[in-house]
Amino acid sequence: MIRKDLTIRYACGSYWIISTDVHLYADASYHAPVMTNETGYHIWICLKKHFSIEETAETISGLYHISYDNALQDTKEFILLLKQNGCMEGLWKYSSLAAVIP
């Protein structure tokens, strides 16, 4: 699940994932903002609404008129980006990603 202190904002032509917790900026748990594009923004919104990976891929497929498989791959890559940047916490809800995301 996405950390509760994170939000996404649009600035300078990109979307930025940032922390809203001012205390994080003073300690070792600080993570730099993560830049993403419009597709990442829509995947973010789906994940914040607790969509499954499959539901997210279906949404992205319909939104951008791409194949489900391409949307699924994009979704997996975005979730991996989130995990690598410390944006995920708690138990991993998306069991279908267990083999993809270490």
What do these predicted ranges mean?
Residues 1-14:
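Hydrophobic packing positions characteristic
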